[in-house]
């Protein structure tokens, strides 16, 4: 970690993170190979064993300096030569190392925050296991639910723009842009399937990093609910140390929302709103009225489009009344059964004897 820090100290006053030199360091790929999510990435390719994998990486990095080795054809076939090797194999190898590199700013900020000051504990930051108490204890007392499919970026460039808030190294962002645009037709990193995300299994680490970066931006609009919500962490966020910085980053956006949405701030004063998220969808449940949930629905759509440049159609947000709706979440069907009681009233006529 000390060896990584020196690349950040070159221009610290301007807060530029020089990550690009790390791409050409061989030990980065050894780290990705030993501690990455796809340990078998080097072993699945015929003709390459564990002992020769680092030598292959070193040759690939050396050839990146030479322009004549970028033999990229218009045809997106798996047999195209990229850096003198199989295109998919070379891309996987380099992008795995690149994934480790772009995670460094997140880990360094986490370490500095731990050493510099005590982190405020948020009692609403709960694990995936908090969903079940929510369904058992809170669900029965709510009236309406918004079943939300997490919106996906309109364009791959949106993912790059999202990382610009974290990584200030232009060269690294250009390389990421090259990866995304060159391989957007090859088993896409983040593929919208039925308006939900599907991460590539061939490069899971980079897919999860980009996915969680995008979801962190999407969820930042719920800053006003952080003290009341039942927040469930995504089960696929293991590759991104984002949770602490998620709450630190959204504090900066409070002024933006307070300025642009003064008339809508009363929406966030409902103390009976609960929020959970998992498996490409999120749920916003409330004890409020149907009018309040409709206002939430159109506010979310407009806010995502204006501030985060993500496309979410109103038809991807379903408003349902819990008395007539079964909630499908994490393989469980939950419904609220109304206990009706019948009351009989009888008017007694007073008779007066005259």
Curated annotation (Swiss-Prot):
Q: Where in the cell is it found?
A: Plastid, Chloroplast
One annotated GO biological process: tRNA processing
An example of a Gene Ontology cellular component annotation for this protein is: chloroplast
Specify whether Mitochondrion is a keyword of the entry. no
Q: What is its main location?
A: plastid
An example of a GO molecular function for this protein is:
RNA binding
Pfam families the record matches: MatK_N (PF01824)
Q: Which segments of the protein form a coiled coil according to its record?
A: none
Name of the protein this chain belongs to: Maturase K
Q: Which organism is it from?
A: Hydrangea quercifolia (Oakleaf hydrangea)
């Amino acid at each position: 970690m000390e060896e990584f820090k020196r690349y950040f100290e070159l221009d610290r006053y301007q807060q530029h993170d020089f990550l690009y030199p790390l791409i050409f360091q061989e030990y980065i790929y050894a780290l990705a190979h030993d501690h990455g999510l796809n340990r078998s990435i080097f072993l699945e390719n015929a003709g390459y064993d564990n002992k020769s994998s680092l030598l292959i990486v070193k040759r690939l990095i050396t050839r990146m300096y030479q322009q004549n080795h970028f033999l990229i054809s218009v045809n997106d076939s798996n047999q195209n030569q990229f850096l003198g090797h199989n295109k998919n194999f070379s891309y996987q190898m380099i992008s795995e190392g690149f994934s480790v590199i772009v995670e460094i700013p997140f880990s360094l900020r986490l370490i500095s925050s731990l050493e510099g000051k005590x982190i405020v504990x948020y009692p609403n930051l709960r694990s995936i296991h908090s969903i079940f108490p929510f369904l058992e204890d809170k669900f029965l007392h709510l009236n309406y639910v918004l079943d939300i499919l997490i919106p996906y970026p309109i364009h791959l460039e949106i993912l790059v723009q999202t990382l610009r808030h974290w990584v200030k190294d232009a060269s690294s962002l250009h390389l990421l842009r090259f990866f995304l645009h060159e391989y957007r037709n090859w088993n896409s990193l983040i593929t919208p399937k039925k308006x939900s995300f599907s991460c590539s299994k061939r490069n899971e680490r980079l897919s999860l990093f980009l996915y969680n970066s995008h979801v962190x931006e999407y969820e930042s609009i719920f800053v006003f609910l952080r003290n009341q919500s039942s927040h469930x962490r995504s089960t696929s966020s293991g590759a991104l140390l984002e949770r602490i910085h998620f709450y630190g980053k959204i504090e900066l956006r409070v002024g933006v929302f307070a300025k642009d949405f003064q008339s809508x701030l009363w929406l966030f004063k409902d103390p009976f709103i609960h929020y959970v998220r998992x498996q490409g969808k999120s749920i916003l449940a409330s004890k409020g009225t149907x009018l309040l949930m409709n206002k939430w629905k159109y506010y979310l759509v407009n806010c995502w489009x204006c501030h985060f440049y993500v496309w979410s159609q109103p038809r991807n947000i379903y408003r349902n009344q819990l008395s007539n709706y079964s909630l499908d979440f994490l393989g469980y069907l939950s419904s609220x059964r109304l206990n009706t009681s019948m009351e009989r009233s009888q008017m007694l006529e007073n008779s007066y004897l005259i």
